[in-house]
């Protein structure tokens, strides 16, 4: 369970210097928790110049019960790695066969994974005692506190993360007080950045790692990244048009930004110009490039009743003309 669902969260927050407001996600209820809900409809698409040819369509490459597909990245030989939120595992899946295996266990409700250009692999852990854990090259706790207090004291819940080439990690906290944008430097010391970003969610670096993009509801913010990893010059990068609010994001080789919106993927040019929308099914909440040539756009989809036995996840894929950034996993 995530930290906010744990009864012990009250004791943790009571000890914070400035206790944050309680955080929660409403439990949704499907028509029946005994019968699997129907899979979402996968719509056809219109062309986006240089990105997507007309008439392409999504296909399902993997599905499973529960809230168990989140924070995915490309992995070796065209495979996909993702976090199992409910099961507290990290899995690796081959889209060509649909076969998956557990590669890391006991992640304390791990909700997203990220691998930097230097090969370091991290997972964001959403359970009580929230943290950023390093998985490779050596498994160990990387960041567990902010200003001497548990990460829970910032409010909300850890959502997404982005490892950089320095050995640090940017991460988002949805529901944080004031701003949910954080950076854990290579020593694991955490700093908070930004103003007016309480709904921070998807977080991604540009290919040259000089710009950090963060979604906040229907707005995508951009930050300049300094040489030491600190952030400056917060600004609005773009407004989403295709859905309900920004979530997991990706970049391609040309620096375009792809943002999951809840029912589509919105695409922006590097200067923030809106390029188009790739329609998808309801519940589309994350996207990334993968495949051996990184010309396949994958997306993760949640449907059914959140927090109920009817919850389902699936991974879908669509071929693109654009190529995902090849210099790192995502």
Regions found by a protein language model. Name each.
Residues 1-330:
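Sequence-structural signature of mature extracellular/luminal beta-sheet repeat domains
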């Amino acid at each position: 369970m995530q930290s906010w669902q744990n009864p012990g969260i009250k004791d943790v927050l009571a000890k914070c210097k400035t206790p944050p407001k309680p955080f929660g996600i409403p439990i949704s209820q499907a028509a029946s928790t005994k019968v699997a809900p129907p899979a979402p409809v996968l719509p056809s698409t219109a062309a986006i110049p240089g990105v997507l040819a007309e008439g392409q369509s999504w296909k399902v490459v993997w599905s499973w019960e529960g809230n168990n597909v989140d924070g995915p990245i490309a992995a070796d030989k065209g495979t996909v790695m993702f976090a199992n939120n409910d099961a507290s595992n990290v899995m690796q899946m081959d889209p060509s066969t649909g076969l998956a295996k557990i590669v890391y266990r006991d992640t304390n409700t791990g909700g997203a994974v990220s691998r930097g250009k230097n090969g370091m692999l991290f997972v964001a852990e959403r359970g009580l005692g929230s943290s950023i854990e390093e998985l490779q090259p050596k498994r160990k706790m990387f960041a567990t506190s902010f200003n001497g207090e548990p990460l829970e004291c910032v409010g909300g819940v850890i959502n997404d993360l982005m490892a950089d080439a320095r050995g640090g990690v940017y991460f988002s906290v949805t529901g944080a007080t004031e701003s949910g944008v954080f950076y854990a430097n290579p020593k694991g010391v955490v700093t908070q950045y930004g103003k007016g970003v309480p709904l921070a969610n998807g977080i991604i670096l540009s290919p040259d790692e000089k710009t950090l993009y963060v979604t906040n509801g229907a707005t995508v913010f951009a930050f300049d990244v300094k040489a030491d990893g600190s952030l400056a010059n917060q600004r609005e990068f773009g407004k989403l048009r295709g859905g309900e609010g920004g979530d997991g994001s990706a970049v391609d080789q040309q620096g375009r930004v792809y943002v999951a919106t809840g029912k589509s993927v919105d695409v922006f040019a590097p200067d923030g110009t809106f390029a188009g929308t790739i329609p998808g099914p309801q519940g589309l909440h994350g996207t990334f490039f993968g495949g051996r040539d990184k010309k396949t756009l994958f997306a993760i989809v949640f449907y059914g009743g959140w927090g109920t036995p009817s919850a389902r996840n699936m991974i879908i894929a669509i071929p693109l003309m654009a190529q995902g950034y090849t210099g790192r996993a995502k």
